[in-house]
């Protein structure tokens, strides 16, 4: 009888060991799958990778809708602010229409549009993707700032990859009194005064 119990106990141990090793194997496979998916997503939205995009529709000077990875996304341009044209309960601000038209013109005539995330948040509180837009290889934000149609704004670490470049362009636009800089006192730390 003891021999029979011992054999049953041994058999039970063997079955338990087999099952546990199978579970561990399944758990490891699941972890490997999760890791692989995470790595693929991370590669897709790498901080230094420009993602091909298509222009869908225009919103205003610093916001647009692009098709990225086959999905339409509202995109807010990082590190800049243009005068308002579509904000509820806000009058159209000076140079807002010019900034809006210029953004639409550049995006609608581009041969190639690419989108790049920076470090930090990938979306804002409104669900808009946050990033840099390149039109035919040129940083769209820099074009708008250089032409006096946008100010450098919403600077938050670690989202500062092109900050120095944009600040340099802004300084030149200021010195030449272009666009928003042609109205004394119009540009403030908090936006635009009129």
Predicted feature locations:
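Small beta-barrel nucleic-acid-binding modules, primarily SNase/OB-fold domains
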Residues: 2-13, 19-194
């Amino acid at each position: 009888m003891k021999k029979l119990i011992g054999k049953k106990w041994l058999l039970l141990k063997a079955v338990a060991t087999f099952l546990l090793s199978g579970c561990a194997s399944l758990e490891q496979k699941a972890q490997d799958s999760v890791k692989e998916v995470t790595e693929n997503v991370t590669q897709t939205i790498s901080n230094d990778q420009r993602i091909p995009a298509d222009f869908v529709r225009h919103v205003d000077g610093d916001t647009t809708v692009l098709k990225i990875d086959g999905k339409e996304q509202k995109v807010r341009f990082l590190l800049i602010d243009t005068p308002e044209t579509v904000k509820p309960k806000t009058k159209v601000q000076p140079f807002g229409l010019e900034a809006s038209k210029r953004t639409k013109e550049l995006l609608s005539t581009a041969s190639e549009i690419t989108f790049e995330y920076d470090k930090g948040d990938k979306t804002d509180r409104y669900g808009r993707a946050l990033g840099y837009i390149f039109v035919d290889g040129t940083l769209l934000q820099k074009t708008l700032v250089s032409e006096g149609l946008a100010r450098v704004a919403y600077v938050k670490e670690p989202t500062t990859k092109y900050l120095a470049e944009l600040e340099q362009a802004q300084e030149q636009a200021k010195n030449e009194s272009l666009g928003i800089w042609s109205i004394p006192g119009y540009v403030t730390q908090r936006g635009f005064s009129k």
